[in-house]
Amino acid sequence: MSKPPRDYARIGTNTYFVTASAWGHRSLFQSERIASLLINTLSHYRSAQKYLLHEFVIMPNHIHLMFTPSEITLERAMQFVKGGFSYRVKKELGIDAEVWARGYVDHRIRDQNDYERHLSYVRNNPVKAGLVKLAEEYPYSSAREGIELDPRPQGLKPRIMKTA
């Protein structure tokens, strides 16, 4: 009997913070055409209900996502994002080159405090990198207006407030 996927028991219930880098850490995503295509790809798979998309930022050489895969494993969701985007780059832009570095780094969001910490990191990444002064000014981020996102995941443990 084959071994179930790593996230089998928790499919559709875990929210992740994921970082994926461009091949060779090139600044591939600073191109407006490429960044827009990546946003379109993220939106496409969100609309196809492959995942709930909570936040994202596309930096010049990497991306950060906060999402909850729907009825699929994290690995499969990332295959949609990375593989789907690579296919579209080659087909629609005629760029026949490696797009992504192998793998990705993931962290399962554990509670509301963890969610807020990663949300702040995603939103402020372009500010911290000196690309903009305000997160809302960065064009390739869910912090700007007009980006359709899914609500905060349900079922996160409440934040524990420390009292004096």
Predicted regions and their residues:
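Short catalytic/metal-binding and nucleic-acid-binding patches
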Residues: 1-164
